[in-house]
């Protein structure tokens, strides 16, 4: 397609303006670390992450335009490019890496070292950028008219609107201030309780909520529809399944509970939360796995056509013009970088991956980077089935590793390491595509943005290990505070293939529940995540969704935009307490 040849970006190719400056790099690195930490906590707690591009863009505009009195839209764009890389890297890392901490808690292995986490994050992030760069001309330029890249286009619109003034940043900073005050009142002064609950003793059920602005922000962002499906999943778990378990089997015990620990004893000692953590989580994990597989199956025609079309588009090669807006990283740099990352993955002892695993990473990594880069252009990053890609990778790689003779905990750690790298590759490739679309619309230099992506990956990659260790030290993974739903699911998949020692009855209950939801045309993943997570989290998310519904009914479009910005600020600062 050649419609793009007539496209004129906001900043013409012949005009040179500030992009990569000390200010943009420092601000971008700070935001990459902050948003990466915030999204890591958010994803581990409620099983979903939010885009950082727009809040990063608004904050950068506020600082650069209002405080520093500079007028440089491309400088602000580079800030959001670097900053959003941290959010995407965290989203990929938290889906898999906490499984290693869960095994350490069970005494199967030592906790992963900071070096291991950092190298996996860096290698996955850098490969995600490098795999995507050769696709830019095919996807962003040649198919400009057909691949819309919703988040990338929206971010460009926000930056263009900011050219009229930087006042919008005040809403983000006011949201941050409100969140900081609230956290101080709840956790510092303890004037307001952090959670409230009500137990129905005769029914053996329980309902409650946690009083945190971050959860309200999530509910507001996802909206009432998704929030309600999550809440219904929790209601089914806590008001139907838990009471049924207590009613029909009080004097029995089921795996994985310790032999002799009856259901009645579990409930007497720990209440409904003990039944949830021992049994319902496995049902939820089965539902999440099924939801991911269903999502992947439904996306297969699109995935196949996406990969085929991307390969066809690349046959013509990259644009070799000298125009500033046509400049990419040189192919020899890309190839050397890919080879270097693969050698590090294979050769460094801290990463538990052998040459076969490194080969799997190259094959699956490039495939899913291509798929992710194109799919986010068609359906947006929010609908990109990264977890489904991770499940498919783990299923195949675990079977290959087991077939090669590497079994036990060593084989399981290798499978998780491979899955972690692939998950990060897919997430970063999708983010890079969105950012390059923003730059294409604004007239940014692609090469500069690609370097910015690498800077963001390195900054957040160096920080993510510390974030995971802090969360583990504060609460530990797998409990009510930090359930880590996707990581628990990946752990379950690997264990099931390697050892076959899972409570399959509970898992298949979740499978059939998910299939039932699909038959009823109810979105499976929100319901499954709600079933897996504690009801305390989803009740607060539901309230946020209701607030969004009420606000949407009363406010016009401009005010909705302002409300979204307040929510973003509230969400991100409320998570900084980690």
Go through each PLM region and give its residues.
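Juxtamembrane interface elements at the cytosolic ends of transmembrane helices
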Residues: 2-8, 130-158, 189-197, 215, ...
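N-terminal alpha-helical transmembrane segments of multi-pass membrane transport
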Residues: 2-112, 132, 136, 140-207, ...
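Inter-helical loop and helix-membrane interface segments of multi-pass membrane transporters/permeases
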Residues: 8, 100-116, 144, 153, ...
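Hydrophobic core segments of alpha-helical transmembrane domains in multi-pass membrane transport
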Residues: 28-39, 57-64, 95-98, 121-133, ...
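Membrane-interface helix-loop-helix modules in multi-pass membrane proteins
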Residues: 68-144, 219-254, 272-291, 412-415, ...
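Helix-loop-helix junctions within the multi-pass membrane cores of secondary transporters/permeases
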Residues: 88-89, 140, 147-180, 319-323, ...
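Membrane-embedded translocation segments of transport machinery
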Residues: 343-434, 441, 470, 481
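Conserved small/polar residues in nucleotide/adenosyl-binding loops
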Residues: 576-578
């Amino acid at each position: 397609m050649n419609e793009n040849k007539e496209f004129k970006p906001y900043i013409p190719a012949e005009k040179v303006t500030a992009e990569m400056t000390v200010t943009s790099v420092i601000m971008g690195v700070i935001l990459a670390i902050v948003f990466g930490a915030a999204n890591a906590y958010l994803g581990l707690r409620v099983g979903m992450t939010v885009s950082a591009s727009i809040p990063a863009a608004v904050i950068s505009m506020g600082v650069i335009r209002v405080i520093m009195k500079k007028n440089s839209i491309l400088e602000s764009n580079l800030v959001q490019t670097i900053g959003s890389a941290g959010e995407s890297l965290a989203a990929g890392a938290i889906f898999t890496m906490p499984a290693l901490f869960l095994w350490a808690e069970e005494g199967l292995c030592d906790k992963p070292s900071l070096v291991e986490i950092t190298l996996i994050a860096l290698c996955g992030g850098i490969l995600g950028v490098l795999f995507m760069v050769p696709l830019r001309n095919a996807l962003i330029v040649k198919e400009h008219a057909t691949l819309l890249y919703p988040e990338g286009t929206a971010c460009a619109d926000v930056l263009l609107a900011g050219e009229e003034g930087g006042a919008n940043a005040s809403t983000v900073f006011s949201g941050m201030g409100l969140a900081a005050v609230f956290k101080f009142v709840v956790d510092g002064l303890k004037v307001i309780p952090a959670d409230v609950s009500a137990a129905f003793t005769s029914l053996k059920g329980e309902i409650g909520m946690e009083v945190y602005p971050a959860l309200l922000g999530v509910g507001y962002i996802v909206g009432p529809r998704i929030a309600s499906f999550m809440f219904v999943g929790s209601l089914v778990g806590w008001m139907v399944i838990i009471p049924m378990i207590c009613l029909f089997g009080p004097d029995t015990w089921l795996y994985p509970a310790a032999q002799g620990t009856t259901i009645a004893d579990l409930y007497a000692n720990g209440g409904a939360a003990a039944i949830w953590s021992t049994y319902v989580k496995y049902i939820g994990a089965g539902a999440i796995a099924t939801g991911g597989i269903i999502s992947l199956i439904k996306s297969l025609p699109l995935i196949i056509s996406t990969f085929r079309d991307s390969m066809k588009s690349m046959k013509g090669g990259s644009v070799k013009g000298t125009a500033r807006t046509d400049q990419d990283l040189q192919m020899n740099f890309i190839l050397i970088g890919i080879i270097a990352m693969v050698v590090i993955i294979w050769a460094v002892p801290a990463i538990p991956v052998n040459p076969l695993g490194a080969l799997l990473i190259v094959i699956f990594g490039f495939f899913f980077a291509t798929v992710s880069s194109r799919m986010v252009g068609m359906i947006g990053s929010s609908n990109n089935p990264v977890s489904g890609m991770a499940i498919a990778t783990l299923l195949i790689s675990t079977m290959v590793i087991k077939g090669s003779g590497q079994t036990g905990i060593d084989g399981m750690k290798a499978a998780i390491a491979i899955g972690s790298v692939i998950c990060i590759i897919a997430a970063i490739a999708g983010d890079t595509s969105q950012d390059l679309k923003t730059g294409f619309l604004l007239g940014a230099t692609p090469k500069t943005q690609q370097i910015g992506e690498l800077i963001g990956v390195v900054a957040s990659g160096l920080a993510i290990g510390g974030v995971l260790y802090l969360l583990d030290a504060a609460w530990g993974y797998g409990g009510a505070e930090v359930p880590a739903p996707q990581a628990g699911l990946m752990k379950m998949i690997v264990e099931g293939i390697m050892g076959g020692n899972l409570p399959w009855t509970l898992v298949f209950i979740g499978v059939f529940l998910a299939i039932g939801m699909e038959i009823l045309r109810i979105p499976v993943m929100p319901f499954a995540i709600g079933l897996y997570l504690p009801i305390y989290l989803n009740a607060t998310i539901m309230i946020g969704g209701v607030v969004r519904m009420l606000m949407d009914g009363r406010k016009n479009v401009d005010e909705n935009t302002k409300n979204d910005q307040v929510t973003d600020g509230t969400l991100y600062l409320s998570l900084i307490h980690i």
